Regions:
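Walker B catalytic acidic pair
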Residues: 52, 115-116, 127
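Canonical AAA+ ATPase core
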Residues: 94-99, 120, 132-229, 269-274
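Conserved beta-strand position immediately N-terminal to the Walker
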Residues: 48, 112, 150
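Conserved alpha-helical scaffold flanking the Walker A/P-loop in AAA+ ATPase domains
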Residues: 37-40, 93-113, 142
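C-terminal engagement/docking regions of AAA+ P-loop ATPases
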Residues: 1-7, 11, 18, 246-326
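Pre-Walker A (pre-P-loop) alpha-helix and adjacent loop at the N terminus of AAA/AAA+ ATPase modules
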Residues: 9-56, 244
Length: 326
């Protein structure tokens, strides 16, 4: 069986994704789906919300990915007393020159880990979310552009935790994906312990031999390649039907917006390219439906009491919408 030659730019996306996975495997055990979904967001200029309990390697994943894609890395620990200026920076008066100089905040970076974003008041959350949307920040009326690969990985604890400020729907909608980071499987946890027993420490990534797999410029090229992936009309209609079906669901106060449809389309193109394909198939769409939709579906209180979850709504929606024939 002669498979048709794939375009070099699509092969480049697939090969880069494999190199990135190989480097990350040196420090991260398991979590394949989490890593692949973060890669999808990076290829689509999307931001990611990671949800999971403390201590399941969310910070390690973020730091390792920054190293592997040659991005500058910064981390902000969100707290109730954090101010917007702590994120974006501030103009400081220099007595020797008599001028104001910009002291840049941690947001001027490539990959930003916004840790426990739901522990800080709405005003500070809004400062970060404006930067995510515009890819620039305004300080004292002056606009400053951010790094072209600026990407936010925000973490939040599951909402039951005390002392949290849940993100409003409009702000949740700014995140391309919400990835639920699970507890590791038994075999994975044993492997993690074995590595630590042999002297591995998560703060010393270079000692684990993690190297950069792609340059910043390569990432920008890969993004261009992904945008060229083909999506046939039936698949476009399939995406629209899935998202529209959530708006009719009786368990929801709020279904997904057209922004969700756009992210589902763009993300499916990245999944196809990472698999070495020049065209999107319905399985690419299904793979991303939950991470794209779960944070955009707002349940009615009575549905929550019945134990219905956003993921279950996504599952039933996919079961109801007819899949286009290939």
């Amino acid at each position: 069986l002669d498979l048709p030659e794939i375009k070099p730019e699509i092969a480049a996306v697939r090969d880069a994704a494999n190199r990135i996975r190989q480097e990350l495997a040196k420090v991260i055990v398991g979590q394949k789906d989490v890593i692949d979904q973060i890669l999808v967001a990076l290829l689509c200029e999307g931001h990611v919300l990671l949800e999971g309990v403390p201590g399941i390697a969310k910070t390690l994943i973020a730091r390792a990915i920054a190293l592997v894609i040659s991005a500058d890395f910064a981390r902000i620990q969100f707290t109730p007393d954090l101010m917007p200026s702590d994120i974006v920076g501030t103009n400081v008066f220099d007595l020797s020159t008599g001028k104001f100089n910009l002291r840049k905040g941690p947001i001027f970076t490539g990959l930003l880990l916004a840790d426990e974003i739901n522990r800080t008041p709405p005003k500070t959350q809004a400062a970060l979310l404006e930067a995510m949307q515009e890819r620039c920040v305004t300080i004292d009326g002056e606009s400053h552009a951010l790094d072209p690969i600026f990407t936010v990985l925000a973490t939040q604890n599951p909402i039951e935790y005390e002392g949290t400020y849940p993100l409003p729907e409009a702000q949740l909608d700014r995140f391309m994906l919400k990835i639920v980071v699970p507890y590791p499987a038994y075999e994975t946890e044993v492997e993690v312990l074995s590595r630590y027993n042999s002297g591995f420490r998560s703060v010393r990534l270079d000692e684990a031999g993690v190297r950069s797999a792609i340059s910043k410029d390569e990432l920008l090229e890969l993004r261009r390649a992904v945008s060229g992936v083909l999506v046939e009309q039936p698949v476009i209609e399939y995406i629209a039907k899935i998202v529209r079906r959530t708006r009719e669901n009786r368990s929801l106060i709020l279904g997904a917006s057209p922004r969700a449809s756009i992210w589902l389309l763009l993300g499916s193109k990245a999944v196809a390219a990472m698999n070495g394909r020049e065209f999107v198939i319905p399985d690419d769409v299904k793979l991303l439906a939950a991470p794209v939709l779960r944070h955009r579906l707002i349940l009615r209180p009575e549905a929550e009491i019945e134990g219905i979850t956003p993921d279950r709504v996504v599952e039933s929606t996919l079961a109801e919408v007819e899949v286009p024939r290939q």
